[in-house]
UniProtKB/Swiss-Prot annotation:
GO terms for biological process: intracellular protein transmembrane transport; protein import; protein targeting; protein transport by the Sec complex. It catalyses: ATP + H2O + cellular proteinSide 1 = ADP + phosphate + cellular proteinSide 2. Pfam families: P-loop_SecA (PF21090), SEC-C (PF02810), SecA_DEAD (PF07517), SecA_PP_bind (PF01043), SecA_SW (PF07516). It is found in: Cell membrane; Cytoplasm. Its EC number is 7.4.2.8. PROSITE patterns: SECA, SECA_MOTOR_DEAD. One of its GO terms (cellular component) is cell envelope Sec protein transport complex. Belongs to the SecA family. It comes from Dehalococcoides mccartyi (strain ATCC BAA-2266 / KCTC 15142 / 195). Residues 916-952 are annotated as: Disordered. Its cofactor is Zn(2+). This is Protein translocase subunit SecA. The lineage of its organism: Bacteria, Bacillati, Chloroflexota, Dehalococcoidia, Dehalococcoidales. Zn(2+) binds at C938, C940, C949, C950.
Amino acid sequence: MFKFFSGFGDSNEKEIRALEPLVDKINQLESSFSALSDEALKAKTAEFKERLKETFETTASAILKDIAGTTAELEEAQKTADNSKQSRLKAKLESLNKDLSVKENAALNAILPEAFAAVREASRRTIGLRHYDVQLIGGMVLHHGKIAEMRTGEGKTLVATLPLYLNSLLGKGVHLVTVNDYLARRDAYWMGPVYHALGVSVSSIYPMQTPTEELPSRLFDPTYTSETPNDPWMHFRPISRQEAYKADITYGTSTEFGFDYLRDNLRPDLAQCVQREMNYAIVDEIDNLLIDEARTPLIISAPDTEAGKLYEVFARLAPRLAAGKDYEINEKDRNAELTEDGWANVEKLLSREGVMKGSSLYDPQNAPLIRHLRNALSAKEFYKKDHQYVVKENEVIIIDEFTGRMMLGRRYSEGLHQAIEAKEHVKIQQESKTYATVTIQNLFRMYRKLCGMTGTAATEAEEFSKIYKLEVVIIPTNKPAIREDYGDQIYKDQSAKFKAVVNEINEMRNLGRPVLVGTVSIENSEMLSNMLKRQGIEHKVLNAKQHEKEAQVVAEAGKPGAVTVATNMAGRGVDILLGGKEPPKDDDKAYSQWQVHHQQVLEAGGLHVIGTERHESRRIDNQLRGRSGRQGDPGSSRFYVALDDDIMRRFGSERIQGIMEWAGMDENTPIENGLVSRTLENAQKRVEGYHFDVRKHLVEYDDVVNKHREVIYAERRKILLGADLKSNILDMIREEIMTQTAEHTQGYDSSEWNLEGLVTHIGGIFALPAEINAEALAKLSQEEITELLTRTAEELYQKKEAEIGAGSMRLLERIIMLHTLDSLWVEHLTIMENLRREIGLQAFAQRDPLIAYKNEGHVRFQELLETIKHDVVHNIYRVNIQIQHQTESATAKAASRPVQQQKPLPAAPAAAIPGVSAKAATQPAAPAAKEVGRNDPCPCGSGKKYKKCCGK
């Protein structure tokens, strides 16, 4: 059936061949589904669901019963300190859930041919698109939890409808993850009629603009019409966040899915949570998210106070330090290390500024200054305006190195963004305190079934397999690919290279071919634009500064003779159609004109792509090439390289320069041969291998905090679900009494016991009756003391409950547990961040930093658990409910009005790579009752001022 397997490899071909019988079966069903009425086609969904239900009742009922029993048993075990039993039950539950997934997939496989046939027919009737056979193959690969590599223009958006519909039949919700908000709306709206024809609901998650926004999402509903004139989304009905997640299929970005997960784990009430179980997700452009964005965790934080003075001091200091004299630059690892002369110079300058304490920068009290120094040097050497960021409206905005887009709202973390703001003399914003965080890697590893689509995944197949356990399957094209990829041309310097680029642009343009030129930075795109203007060559520029015009520029990029200069992969997700954007067929004049242009470009040779520099990743280069030659169209591509390009300067340019000098070539004569191309490719492979190791290391480090997060979030959810907190808290009290009694009554001689200390400590937990004092306890044995204090604690607990009522006591238990858990978890995250930064020093002691981090992290986590128990025990008797309306904790407020951040973490602490953070501060929600003053007593009853307690 499929003839285009050349170069795919035997295993990939076998994978495709194994799916061919299913394609044949779907094709055989086509005529019978075409004969169905619209109502009968929609009724197929109810039929499929009923068949799945019947299958589960016969094949999975025992597993479901076992899961329920094991879950109940685990909840009981968690009330005790039997860790071995808990571990055994968790392992059993994980195994049972895997067995259930196998049963579910088997049931879905049984109805796959009919379900795919139904989607194909619904698509043909509603949007006029019929799935090709290769698209059916792509849908099956996605359903099986693998990555489908499909070339540009092969219809990934349409392919996704097949597995999304099939897996939505389980009723657990499925997610389609896009690379930006526009595509989340466009794809949900475009495919909406297909799902609606099948009786399946589809929603799109919109970014929340304010914390009080009630309807930050949309549901496709043909019966609804927007009141906004010329609304491109006229059938998108506004709905709440919870309703969006209750839809059968939900489209959104990784950022929105991730922040909703974090926000749900900060909410004070389960009824406020929006997400369901993480069931099945298809990630569009999966390489962009799980490879390029892998080092970017999602963080919810709030401003932390730190004066901007130090940033300004170091912004003045950095230009006074000379590279090569005061510090050495390591471009490969992107860091700068001070020389001995540099240390002396810095100490002298800082003393003059009056910010250094003592006589040496090595003194412990000067440790924060070293971080400021590193950030200032990084801002000076590695973060250049119009390369890594732009300054717009007195604000530093990050540029996405992979797409060239402005990353509005994102900020570098760990003080780097502030250092750049100081360098650029714009307002320095406050640093942040982390309330909740999860890496992109761990977020998507939570899904029971994960898959993805992209045009370029094969080069990263090893990483997908090792980190995510995802197999890459290359899907054959619907038509043979005929694009011609020319060899690289290498020049001695940038000037000669860009002159040659301009000449080739002019040559192709004169042939009537559209030209797409990819640059690596805004600066290069604007420099090339100026060169083209001087030559009188009409062109469009697409970079972060013009991102608003992106859709329009991409739509016109395929016209005859059109020249488009774009940073990297700006416009990814939108096809460049030869002849320009295809107009509606009912517009005779416009459509006729488009056909002429389309044919003209085809005959001229199609779209020509020029890369002005090799990227560190072959995959990014392939993405640029992939803009040309879609759906069997003609096209070509060529890369131009200079010896002073970043990748050439960092890897292997000396060898190539030696070849050029040996050949006696001048600067305007290019070299083009296999040796140079292989050298370049080997350099890219080395960089890819380095970044793979970085990301693999990141997973290993983040898994430490991830295990902590799983435990804390599970405990938090149990509290919200109404777990028996009373027995848990009483157990904590008994344990505290036993521990303190044992500690204060050591030794056989009771005269040596510290009973005064014991009475003081227990009196700090609850008010002891007058008759229980050191003198009375001296007459008792250790066991009798423990028994007396425990009995007294239980009686006082019951007395408190009788005074305020059982319902109020349960509420008080929940408030104290949540407040304690949340506040201490925030502190623990800060401790782990600091530990991660410092642990790299273990390498100097010949210790593996990762092992040291795991060991230290375990100690810190045990301390966290003990501190939680301690604080709960010491607060439960002292705190009273004084008002009807529960006041939100600081953590709950962070959930409603987060400062959202994203930052790449170093793979290992020694790497010292400052990260990226995203900030989208919003206004606080209006209070339900009279606002509490900062100096008023806290309404939670702690006795502290509001600003020192819940108002932090």
